Amino acid sequence: MIDRITEQPFCQARISGSTFVNADCFDVFPFIEDKSIDAVIIDPPYFEVKGNFDFVFKSENDYLQFIENTIIECKRCLKDSGSLFIYCSQEMSAYIDLMLRKYFAIKNRLIWFRSGGVSPKKKFKVSHEPLFYCVNDIKNHTWNLDDIRVKSIYADKDKRLNPLGKSPDDVWCIPNLVGKKNEKVPHPTQKPLELCDRIIKCSTNENDLILIPFAGSGSEFVSAIKLNRKSIGIEKEKQYYDVAVRRLSKYCG
């Protein structure tokens, strides 16, 4: 599967059996076979002013059509037992919720509570991002609960509880990356590795193949390699591709 992409004249970096491509994801999709991907993580532009990549959409409808086209391609690539995660802005979440229902079973409507950021004076502070967790088959998909359990406050008091902990809530309190944190790189919407790790651990097994069509700073790609998964990362913007490749070289040697 990955060989079909590496044979193409894309600018790309091969790392640990995975590939990170500098291209538009719609130029790469044709080289990905139907039902060949175990999980997809979509972190698309948000139709907000967060960098040059958000200025390409002429209207809200134009943006939503772009998102639906992405979902359709990812649906084609995904195995019947596969999972798809997609981030979006709060403003777009209702539209994308309805859109996803046409193609998937929505298993969870997760909230990434990220804190940080500037507190506005005329409205409540925006401190979370929606994250949809979807599956092709609600009865048959990879779900590794034991790999993501969190400690229960009652763990020491009730011996009947699972010693590995409880299932995480649907609100994930994982701090955003700000300032000079060790993993911070020059990217406006970089996701923390802790967040990416949880997504990948719960929905895939070792040696599974993950598709990341908007790979950005490379966080999901780094997590996949750390966790012994294969991945196809795609990033259109050359400046962020270069940032990610430098980061991958550091993490993956």
Residue ranges and their predicted role:
Residues S249-C252:
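Conserved phosphoryl-transfer catalytic core
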Residues I2-I234, Q239-Y241:
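Core catalytic lobe of class I
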Residues A244-V245:
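Conserved SAM-binding loop
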